[in-house]
Design a protein with these regions (language model features):
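Hydrophobic alpha-helical segments
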Residues: 2-122
């Protein structure tokens, strides 16, 4: 969710950081490379796909009249309980805010190929 929202928002700093964090946590390179193409990729679970759909629609509010569609919410509710949906919404709101701060501040992606997991400031 953080990677996809950061990609949509054009935040190189956050995209770079969250990909490095995910790789450090054991995520595969293939899945990381396919986040932007999740609709066509077969490497994501149905729950992950539902979360990515909510992330896209919630990030592209200006592009989608009414925000997240009823269909996307219903699909997400099949995979996540109420607390998990609240966590998803909260995560999405926070990453969108951080993306905007980083883009406005013109924070460049890290120059290093490694990062300290959890590092969030320049």
């Amino acid at each position: 969710v953080k990677i996809r929202a950061s990609q949509i928002n054009g935040c190189g700093f956050c995209t770079d950081m969250h990909i490095k964090d995910a790789a450090h946590a054991g995520e595969t390179a293939q899945r990381l490379h396919l986040v932007a193409a999740w609709r066509e990729a077969t490497v994501f679970t149905e729950a992950e796909r539902a979360a990515l759909e909510v992330a896209e629609q919630g990030t592209r509010i200006a592009d989608a009249a009414g925000g997240v569609t009823d269909e996307a919410w219903a699909n997400a509710a099949e995979h996540f309980d109420e607390d998990q949906l609240v966590a998803l919404i909260s995560l999405l709101a926070v990453i969108n805010a951080y993306n905007r701060i980083s883009v406005i501040n013109r924070s460049p992606p890290a120059r290093s190929t490694s990062c300290t997991p959890g590092f969030t400031a320049r």
